[in-house]
């Protein structure tokens, strides 16, 4: 009987957190948000059967932060039980893998493995409940470094602080790196992030050389 009651509460908690996430996601902002909103809307109807039936939901740094804060507030108010948040390695900053996750970095640094390690260490320093750093993952041993985390939402104000400090860090590590590699969309995202956190946090941005000017200088130099 107790197991059945637990299953009811677990299912109710899933439904409540589904609705809470939907309230935070703006489906009209961009197609990806609309897709994520529809996915979480239909998650209960699709009757997931793997493991705990936990949801995989992709959001940007601030979307993840806001959803985590909402969940933690729901735990604090007794609306749901404690929640474990985590993420997989198909993410911006958690994995160095030149054959997959970092294959779109074209400045030559895609073969270095410092990003996942920095992400791992930063998550530890910011108070994540669980952190992991390991070799391999999808592309094979020696071809990737993966880092992950788990964060228990217990309803405490301390966890609110950890969310505010660690969730944006975990995501923006990878956006920052692609920004430094001159990825146009990452540069736009970092510029928006810096504007949002002006006075409290900032990510350095690359100085983009003028291709026409460089070509002109080389032509003039080689013509002499």
Task: Put a short name on every predicted segment.
Residues 1-5, 9:
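Single conserved hydrophobic/aromatic residue that forms the stacking wall/gate
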Residues 17, 22-56, 63-70, 76-78, ...:
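Extended, well-ordered protein cores
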Residues 190-224:
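C-terminal catalytic or substrate-handling cores of phosphate/nucleotide-
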Residues 53-57, 97-109:
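Short, basic, glycine/proline-bearing loop/turn elements
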Residues 21, 36-39, 63-71, 81, ...:
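General structural feature for long, well-ordered alpha-helical segments within catalytic domains
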Residues 108, 112-116, 120-124, 128-130, ...:
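Catalytic or ion-translocation cores adjacent to nucleophile or general acid/base/metal-coordination motifs
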Residues 87-91, 137-139:
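Glycine-rich beta-alpha junction loops
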Residues 63, 69-81, 122-130, 167-176, ...:
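Generic secondary-structure signature for well-ordered alpha-helical cores
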């Amino acid at each position: 009987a107790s197991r059945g009651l637990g299953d009811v509460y677990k299912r109710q908690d899933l439904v409540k957190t589904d609705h809470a996430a939907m309230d935070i996601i703006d489906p009209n902002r961009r197609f990806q948000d609309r897709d994520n909103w529809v996915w979480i809307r239909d998650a209960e109807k699709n009757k997931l059967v793997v493991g705990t039936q936990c949801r995989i939901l992709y959001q940007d740094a601030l979307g993840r932060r806001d959803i985590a804060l909402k969940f933690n507030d729901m735990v604090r108010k007794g609306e749901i039980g404690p929640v474990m948040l985590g993420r997989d390695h198909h993410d911006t900053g958690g994995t160095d893998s030149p054959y997959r996750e970092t294959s779109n970095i074209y400045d030559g640094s895609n073969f270095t493995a410092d990003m996942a390690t920095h992400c791992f260490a930063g998550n530890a320093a910011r108070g994540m409940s669980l952190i992991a750093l390991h070799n391999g993952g999808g592309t094979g041993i020696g071809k990737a470094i993966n880092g992950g985390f788990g964060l228990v939402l217990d309803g405490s104000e301390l966890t609110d602080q950890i969310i505010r400090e660690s969730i944006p860090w975990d995501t923006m590590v990878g956006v920052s790196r692609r920004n430094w590699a001159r990825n146009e969309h990452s540069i736009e995202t970092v510029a928006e992030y810096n504007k949002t956190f002006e006075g409290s946090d900032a990510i350095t941005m690359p100085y983009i050389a003028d291709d026409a000017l460089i070509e002109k200088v080389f032509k003039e130099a080689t013509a002499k």
